[in-house]
Amino acid sequence: MEAKKIYAQALTDEAFAPFGSVVQQKDDVKMVSANGGTAKKYLKVSESIQNYEKSSSASTRKGVWNFFSTHPSVHPANDEHAAFQISVLERHPFTTQTFIPMCRSSDEQAYLIAVAPNAPDGMPDWNQTQAFVAKGAQGVTYSAGVWHAPMVTIGKETMLAAFNYENGVAEDDCQVQSTESPIEVFIKIST
């Protein structure tokens, strides 16, 4: 079956709001002086939420940090666009999940985000998939239950720090769905 084609857009607060929040330095966020005046602390740039009490499992949950060392999935060529096919989406039904890129320059295209809303049956609505390109200074927090592609990095190996809650029950922590009709995402390469 032929892949549906979509174009990735720049990651912005407004465009991503239905799926979560963008984690980045913002002028409209309250800032206070910290560390004896040697730092600026930007308050509440993103929330970590867990709803494991809605799970049928009685397992204890805990917040965990993980590192993802990802090999590039998108290899920009010398042309204007690069492409990547998405055939798998995952969600964390009871927790937000935050990714923060490390060791990428702030204005370089660092990774691709693909998200889909829930269909009426609770599975991903593949036809409504949207894609975003995040820069090196942008993290992202997926809301609990948001279908998203596994991490797709652009151009070079990238380390990402990730935070979410887990209770050790596979179906509670991560649900995965695949499709035989992949989504082909085109990414405009910035030079």
From Swiss-Prot:
GO cellular component: cytosol; nucleus
Keywords (A to Z) from UniProt: Lyase, Purine metabolism
Signal peptide residues on this chain, from the entry's feature table: none
Function: Catalyzes the catabolism of the allantoin degradation intermediate (S)-ureidoglycolate, generating urea and glyoxylate. Involved in the utilization of allantoin as secondary nitrogen source when primary sources are limiting.
Family assignment from sequence similarity: Belongs to the ureidoglycolate lyase family.
Known EC number: 4.3.2.3
Organism for this UniProt entry: Schizosaccharomyces pombe (strain 972 / ATCC 24843) (Fission yeast)
Protein's name in the database: Ureidoglycolate lyase
GO molecular function, one term: ureidoglycolate hydrolase activity
GO biological process: allantoin catabolic process; purine nucleobase catabolic process
Source domain of life: Eukaryota
Keyword rRNA-binding: no
Subunit structure: Homodimer.
UniProt pathway annotation: Nitrogen metabolism; (S)-allantoin degradation
Catalytically driven reaction(s): (S)-ureidoglycolate = urea + glyoxylate
Matches recorded under InterPro entries: RmlC_Cupin_sf, UAH_cupin, Ureidogly_lyase, Ureidoglycolate_lyase_dom_sf
